[in-house]
Amino acid sequence: MESQQLSQHSPISHGSACASVTSKEVHTNQDPLDVSASKTEECEKASTKANSQQTTTPASSAVPENPHHASPQPASVPPPQNGPYPQQCMMTQNQANPSGWSFYGHPSMIPYTPYQMSPMYFPPGPQSQFPQYPSSVGTPLSTPSPESGNTFTDSSSADSDMTSTKKYVRPPPMLTSPNDFPNWVKTYIKFLQNSNLGGIIPTVNGKPVRQITDDELTFLYNTFQIFAPSQFLPTWVKDILSVDYTDIMKILSKSIEKMQSDTQEANDIVTLANLQYNGSTPADAFETKVTNIIDRLNNNGIHINNKVACQLIMRGLSGEYKFLRYTRHRHLNMTVAELFLDIHAIYEEQQGSRNSKPNYRRNLSDEKNDSRSYTNTTKPKVIARNPQKTNNSKSKTARAHNVSTSNNSPSTDNDSISKSTTEPIQLNNKHDLHLGQELTESTVNHTNHSDDELPGHLLLDSGASRTLIRSAHHIHSASSNPDINVVDAQKRNIPINAIGDLQFHFQDNTKTSIKVLHTPNIAYDLLSLNELAAVDITACFTKNVLERSDGTVLAPIVQYGDFYWVSKRYLLPSNISVPTINNVHTSESTRKYPYPFIHRMLAHANAQTIRYSLKNNTITYFNESDVDWSSAIDYQCPDCLIGKSTKHRHIKGSRLKYQNSYEPFQYLHTDIFGPVHNLPNSAPSYFISFTDETTKFRWVYPLHDRREDSILDVFTTILAFIKNQFQASVLVIQMDRGSEYTNRTLHKFLEKNGITPCYTTTADSRAHGVAERLNRTLLDDCRTQLQCSGLPNYLWFSAIEFSTIVRNSLASPKSKKSARQHAGLAGLDISTLLPFGQPVIVNDHNPNSKIHPRGIPGYALHPSRNSYGYIIYLPSLKKTVDTTNYVILQGKESRLDQFNYDALTFDEDLNRLTASYHSFIASNEIQESNDLNIESDHDFQSDIELHPEQPRNVLSKAVSPTDSTPPSTHTEDSKRVSKTNIRAPREVDPNISESNILPSKKRSSTPQISNIESTGSGGMHKLNVPLLAPMSQSNTHESSHASKSKDFRHSDSYSENETNHTNVPISSTGGTNNKTVPQISDQETEKRIIHRSPSIDASPPENNSSHNIVPIKTPTTVSEQNTEESIIADLPLPDLPPESPTEFPDPFKELPPINSRQTNSSLGGIGDSNAYTTINSKKRSLEDNETEIKVSRDTWNTKNMRSLEPPRSKKRIHLIAAVKAVKSIKPIRTTLRYDEAITYNKDIKEKEKYIEAYHKEVNQLLKMKTWDTDEYYDRKEIDPKRVINSMFIFNKKRDGTHKARFVARGDIQHPDTYDSGMQSNTVHHYALMTSLSLALDNNYYITQLDISSAYLYADIKEELYIRPPPHLGMNDKLIRLKKSLYGLKQSGANWYETIKSYLIQQCGMEEVRGWSCVFKNSQVTICLFVDDMVLFSKNLNSNKRIIEKLKMQYDTKIINLGESDEEIQYDILGLEIKYQRGKYMKLGMENSLTEKIPKLNVPLNPKGRKLSAPGQPGLYIDQDELEIDEDEYKEKVHEMQKLIGLASYVGYKFRFDLLYYINTLAQHILFPSRQVLDMTYELIQFMWDTRDKQLIWHKNKPTKPDNKLVAISDASYGNQPYYKSQIGNIFLLNGKVIGGKSTKASLTCTSTTEAEIHAVSEAIPLLNNLSHLVQELNKKPIIKGLLTDSRSTISIIKSTNEEKFRNRFFGTKAMRLRDEVSGNNLYVYYIETKKNIADVMTKPLPIKTFKLLTNKWIH
C-alpha cells in the first residue's frame, strides 16, 4: 500500500488546507512568554477562514458537551419569575431570539444562568430584544433551516449556495476557571466578530468603532452571562460588575489592554526572531519595521546589539537576498545600517531588471512560435554574489500545507541560471498579472477554488511525493487503481479515482510526462517537485523558474500569496472525460488479470518466479503485461502464510539496541543448567548463571534443586550484590519459559522490585543465545579442568566457578576489553591464581597432639569469594576449606601420594578456618600469622613473658616484687592468677583493623592498679601480684605493666577454697610511694568478672577538691592560681548549690561489669563507671557464665539501671557512620521550576511577579554579557560534553520578593570541562562567630552588603556552551558562555578568585592565613560568603570607603549599614541577630523556624505541653531488623533526611546544646524505625517549643587587656555502637560560646581515659587555629585554656615519662598532646564534672542537669 501525505480539503470541512492546519487555540497552560499577538491574529484569521467555509446540518452543529452548560428546557416549562419584567429575562425564540437563532441549534429557549437567579440580576425591559441581522451575512449562533436539506452541496454550485445559506457561528466555550479568562476573552471577541458585532469591540485606545445599540447591549450582556459563570470570573471582573453589572464593554476594553501590554514585548522578540524577507515588499518598509522593533526592545531594557540583530535579519533573508548570509556572516563589526545598504542595493537592482524585461507572450500559440530563450541582459552588480548557492526546494508551500513528506528527493543546486534567466512573477492578487501574462484555464467543471488559489495554475509542493489534480481534462492513459492509499497531513485518507500521466509541453518545445492521481477531494491542484526532479526538472526559487539541470529554462514560476504556482497552459489536454475515468476499469479490452488470481492459478508460486516464467514464455496463452502486478509486492496470501509458516531468522546484531539503551548491569540474561546425576547429596546438581548485556560480566551460583524458594534466594542475592557493589538497579532480566522462571512467586518478586521479565518466545532458543552459549562454554571448561586435574566429578561446580573467574578477566576480541574492565574493576592478579587442581599442603592449625603432623595434603580449586584465601579440597576429609596457610607443590611427583590420610584426625568444625581472628600476642614474643582467615588456637597468655631472662617454671620469679612485699603473699597471688581465664569479647567490631587491637611489646595479661601520687608524678606502676582490679571510676587507676602468668587454659573459674587476698603493696618504678590494695574476699571475688586492662590507665580518684588544678606549665603557685581564675572567671558555668560531704564507696562494692548492648545507640548514654569490655574465652559456653549472668541481672534489677540491660544474644545491624557535619543530608527544595512558577501556575498575581522576575534576570544576564551574543552555534557542530544544560529556578524569599535565577546543570557537567582542583571557598562559621564576638567586645560597626549576580562578574576560562533561554525560541542553537553562570562546578571558585584579587589589589585587604574568605586590613575586617559580605570596623567611615570601592566594580547593595546606636537587627547567613553596640548580641532563628518547621508535617504539641529537654536518659534505639516495604522505606528515609537536615542546620548555627541528639539520630537516617522517627519528632518538637531561644552574648568586661580562648572537652565512654565513644567540645571566646562539636570517636577506646584523650586531641587543633584567627583580627595578647573533667588525661599530658604506651594509636595521640600543649603556651585545667557544660555534647541528661548546664549561655 502506498502511503501519501498531502494537504487536502476534507469532504466534511470545505475550508482550505492552510486554514485547516493553522487554526489553533492557545491553551490555558501555554507559556505566556511564547504567545505573540501576531501568531494569535494569524491563527484567528485562519480559523475564521475555515469557519466561514463550513456548512453543517442541524444535527452536527452542536457544541461539544460541557458540564457547566445548563440543559435547554422544553418550551412547555414555564420560565422562572425574576425581576420586575415577568418572563422577559428568559428570551424564547418568539420573543428575544433573532430569526433562525436558537441556542446550540435547538429551537428552544435559552437556559438561565446563575446571574439571573442572583439578587444582582435585573433583566432588560420588555422591549429589549436581540438585534436582527441581514440574512446575507448570517446571524449569531444561526443554523440552517431544516428545509435546506443536506448542506454538502455539489462543488459546482457551492458559491451560489453560500449566499443562500445562513452562516453558522460557533459559540465560545464555557469559562471553567478564573485563570482561563484571558484566553476565553479572545474566543468571545472572535464570537462577537463572527456575529457581525466587530464594530462594538473596543480598540486599543479603549473606544469602539461605532456606538452600541440597546439590542446589541442586551445580546452582549446575556451571552456574557451564559458563557462566563460568575464563580469563574477573576476578581477584577467581579469588581467591575459590582459597580455596574451591565458594563461588559469596560471588561472587554480592560482585557484588550491587558493582552496588549502582556504580549507586546514577547511579540517583538518573536517577530524579530522570525523575520522573513525576499524582496516582495519595499526594502524601506522592511527596514522601518526592523528598526522600530529594535528601538522598542532597547527602550524596554532588552538590548539587541548589532551582531545579534544582523544575524536575526540575515537568517530571515531568502531568494536573491539569501547570499548575504554567506558573504556577511564572518564580518564581526557589521552594523544594521550597513546590512540594509546591501539589501537596498539588491532591491533596486531587482526593480531595475524587472522594468527592463520584455513581457511574456500572452497566449500559448504565440509562445510556441517564439523561439527566443529569454536571456537576461547583463547589468553591473552592486555587490558580488556567490554563484554557488544552495537551493531549498522546501519553500513556503510546505509550511503552509503542513505536509510531511514520504519521499524525499535529493535537492539540486538551481539558484543560478547560466546565461539565461527568467525574472520572477509576483502577483498581488489573482487579477494582477506582471509582464502582461494572461492566465487561461480550462472550462472543465471541478471543485471550486479556494480563496487563496490562483486559478489556472498548479501549486508547487515540495512536501508531496505524488501529483494530484482535480480535473480529468489533462489526464492521459487513465486507469483505475483502487489500491493506492493517499493521506493528507492530518492522516486522513483521500479517495483516488484514477491514475494516469500528466504531459507537459514547455516553452523550449520539449515534452515530458509524470504520473498523476485524480481526485476531486482536494483544495488545490498539486504538482510534486519530487516527481519533477525524477524527470530532470527542478524549481529555482531564486529566479522563480522551472529549469533542467543544464540550465535550460522551461517555464516561469508565479508567486501568489504565500505559495508558488506554475501555469496549466503547459499541460496537454486529453479527450478523456470524468465518467470515462470513473469507469475505465470496467472496460474488458483494458482489463488485466489480477495477481491474486494468477497466484492461486499457479500453485501459490511467488511473484518473482511467475514473472520470470512469463518473460521466458514457459507459460503460454498470456503475457507478462496481461497481469496487474501493482499489488504483487504487498500481497499476502493467507493460505501461503498458513501452509508455509516457518521460524523467523535470527537477525545478526539484533541485541545492539539493548546495548545502546541500557547502562551496565541493567539488562541481565539468566539460565539454569542441570541436573548432573550420580553425585553425593552435598554436591550441587544445578547451577544458575547470569550475564550482563553491556559488560558481559558473569555470575554463577550453585543449586541443589530447582524449587521456587531456591531460585528466589539466588535472585535476591544477585540483585542486592549489583545494587551495593555497582550502584546499579536491574531493569530487565531475560530468561526462558521454564517453570522455575514463570512461577508466580518469582513473578511477584520481580514485579515488586520493578524489574521487567523478558521471556523468550515459543521455540526460539536462539533468542536466548547469550545465556545458552555461556553455559556451553562453562561446561566445556569444566570437563577440561576435571580431566586435566583428575579430581572427582562432584567438584564440577568448583571448576565452573574457576572458569567464571578467569572468563571475566579475559578480553573479548570484539570489545578489546575484559568484562571486569567494562565493569570498572581491576584486572585479575595472576599471582593470586593457581592452576585448577594444583597440589598443595595446608597447615593444620589445631592438631590433636603436639607430635601429630602439621600439614595435610590438598588440591587448590579457586580463589575464595568471601575472603583473601583460597578454596582447597582436602581428600582425606572430603571437604573444602578456605585458607591462606598452604604451600604449593611444584610437581605431582611428591610425597602427596605417600601420605596416610586415615592417620590424620582433625577438629570436625573446619568452618573455623574461615573465621576472622586477630591475635593478641605481641610481635616480639610470638611470630604473628599472616593468615587473616584462620583463627589461631594458641592461648595468648601461655607464652607471654614480662622478663624473658626469668625461667618459666619458677612461678615465684614471674614478677620482681619490692623488698617490702611478703613472699607468701606473692606466691599465693601468683598461684591464684595462674587459674584465671581472661576472656575475650564475644564479638569484635568488624571495622577494627588488626593494627588497631594488637598489643605493644610488653602488654600485660592481668589487670593493673596504679598509685595516684606516683601517677601524678609521672610514674608507671607494676602490680606485685595479679590481683583483681577494682572497677570504680573514682578510686581506680590502672597501670601499664603487670606480671606474667602461667598457662590458664585448663582453669575456667576460681577455686572456692582459695585464701583471701591480703593488702598488697605496689611498687612504683617512677615514684617513691607505695600503696596497698584492700583485701578481697572469695565471695566478692566470685561476683567479679575479670576485666582486661585498658591500653591507657583509667581515671584516678576524684575525691579531691574541685579547685584541685593540675597546670601544665610550672610557673609560681600565685601565677598558676591567677591564670586559672582568669580563664574560668567569665565562663558561663553553672552555679552549683553547696553539698554535704559524702563518703566514697568501697571500690570493691562497685557495680560489676555488665555486658551492655553495645550494638545499640543510646540517647541515654552509658556512664563512665558502668560500661566495661568483658573479654571472654571463645571456647566458653553460655552455661559456664550462669553466676555472671545471675549477678548481672540481680544488679541490673536492684540498681534500676535503665541505661543497661543484661547480656543477651543480639544480631548486629551495620549502620552508617556518624556524620560530623551532616553534609549528606538532602535539603528541602524550596525553589520552583519554570513550569511550576509560570506555565502551570494558577495564581495570577504570583505568576505575574515571577514573570517580572524572569525578565529582570534575563536583562541582568544580557547586561553582564553572560554569553556571546554575536554568534549562535549549531548543536551538531559542538562537542556534546561541552554543552551544559540550563534551567530557570524561581524562589520566593523571606522578605516576600520573587526571584528568578538562570542556572546551569552542574550536577551533570562533564569532568573534562572544569578543574577539579579548584575550590569554592566560603567563610567558616567559626570565623563568622569569632568576628561577631570581637565586634561586640570592641564596639565595632557591623555593615551587611550584597553583590547582585556575583558569579557573573567572573570570567570563565573553559569553552562551554549552553542552550539559549526559552523566550528566544532557538532550541536548536547554542551560545557560548563568557561568564561563570550559577550552577557550574567552577563558578564558585572563579568568583572567589575574582573577588579575592579585587579586595587585595584594589581595597588594600589581605586574607587571613588558614581562614578562607576572611580579609582584613588595619581598620576593617570582611567575612565573605559567596555574594554576601559582612564588614566590621571601629569607624563607620572605614566601612563606607570599602563600599565605595566595591561599587566602582560591582553592583553592591547595602542591606544594613549598621550606623544606629540602638538595637539593630540583621539576617546574616540564616542567623537572626539583634545587636546593640557596647551592650549585647543575641543570635537566634525564631522567624525561620516558625516558617520552616510547620512545613515538615510533624505533629506539633500532640499532648498540648512543651518539652523541657530534647531527650531522656536511659532510652536505647532498638536495632532489630526492619520489616518494611521498599516504598515506605524510601519515604521514611526521605522524611528523616528533611528533619535531620533542618535540625543539623540549626544545631551547627547556634543550638549547640542539641548537637548530641542530632549526631546520634543522623547515624540512623537509613534505619527509620518507629522508635527513631518518634525520637526525631521529639527533637523537632523541642526545637519548636524553644524556637524563641537565643544564644546570648554580653560585652566582656575584662580585668586584663587579653583575649581568652577556651575549649571545654568531654567524652562518654562506650555509649555508641561497637564500643565507640561519643566526644564533644565547646569553644568560648571571652566567655561567649562561639561553637560546638559532637561526634562519635573514630577509634574504639578501651577506657574512659582513652576517650577523654581522643576528645582533647580533637579540640586542640581547632583551638590553635582559632587562636591564630583571633590574633590576626585583634592584636591583643591571647590566653588559651583547655578544661577537662579527667584528671588522668591531665596527668598523662603533663607527664615527662618517655615509656611507650601499650596502645600505639592513643600513645601517639598522647605524645602529640604533650608537644602541642608545651609548644603553644596552652593551659590545661581540671573542671568539675557538674560544671562541665560540654557534658551536653556527649550524653542525654536529666531535665534539671540539662537546664543547669545550658541556662547561662542559651535562653
From Swiss-Prot:
Subcellular location field: Cytoplasm; Nucleus
Disulfide cysteine pairs (residue numbers): none
Marked site: Cleavage: H401, N402, N582, N583, A1217, A1218
Motif Bipartite nuclear localization signal, residue range(s) on this chain: 1178-1212
Keyword Hydrolase: yes
Domain RNase H Ty1/copia-type: 1610-1752
UniProt feature, compositional bias: Low complexity: 153-165, 402-418, 960-969
Bias (Polar residues): 1-23, 48-60, 127-152, 1005-1015, 1054-1082, 1101-1111
Principal place of residence: cytoplasm
Highest rank taxon of the organism: Eukaryota
Catalytic activity: DNA(n) + a 2'-deoxyribonucleoside 5'-triphosphate = DNA(n+1) + diphosphate; Endonucleolytic cleavage to 5'-phosphomonoester
Region (Integrase-type zinc finger-like): 583-640
Active-site residue list: D461
Chain residue ranges for the region called Disordered: 1-93, 126-174, 352-421, 956-1087, 1092-1111, 1130-1187
GO CC, one annotated term: nucleus
Enzyme Commission number(s) from the entry: 3.4.23.-, 2.7.7.49, 2.7.7.7, 3.1.26.4
Sites bearing Phosphoserine, chain numbering: S416
Biased composition annotated in UniProt, kind: Basic and acidic residues: 1038-1053
UniProt-recorded Gene Ontology molecular function terms: aspartic-type endopeptidase activity; ATP binding; DNA binding; DNA-directed DNA polymerase activity; RNA binding; RNA-directed DNA polymerase activity; RNA-DNA hybrid ribonuclease activity; zinc ion binding
Assigned keywords, A-Z: Aspartyl protease, ATP-binding, Cytoplasm, DNA integration, DNA recombination, DNA-binding, DNA-directed DNA polymerase, Endonuclease, Hydrolase, Magnesium, Metal-binding, Multifunctional enzyme, Nuclease, Nucleotide-binding, Nucleotidyltransferase, Nucleus, Phosphoprotein, Protease, RNA-binding, RNA-directed DNA polymerase, Transferase, Transposable element, Transposition, Viral release from host cell, Virion maturation, Zinc, Zinc-finger
Protein modification: Initially, virus-like particles (VLPs) are composed of the structural unprocessed proteins Gag and Gag-Pol, and also contain the host initiator methionine tRNA (tRNA(i)-Met) which serves as a primer for minus-strand DNA synthesis, and a dimer of genomic Ty RNA. Processing of the polyproteins occurs within the particle and proceeds by an ordered pathway, called maturation. First, the protease (PR) is released by autocatalytic cleavage of the Gag-Pol polyprotein yielding capsid protein p45 and a Pol-p154 precursor protein.
Note: Retrotransposons are mobile genetic entities that are able to replicate via an RNA intermediate and a reverse transcription step. In contrast to retroviruses, retrotransposons are non-infectious, lack an envelope and remain intracellular. Ty1 retrotransposons belong to the copia elements (pseudoviridae).
Database matches in PANTHER family: TRANSPOSASE, PUTATIVE-RELATED, TRANSPOSON TY4-P GAG-POL POLYPROTEIN
Protein's name according to its UniProt entry: Transposon Ty1-DR6 Gag-Pol polyprotein
Organism of provenance: Saccharomyces cerevisiae (strain ATCC 204508 / S288c)
Taxonomic lineage from the root: Eukaryota, Fungi, Dikarya, Ascomycota, Saccharomycotina
Gene encoding the protein: TY1B-DR6
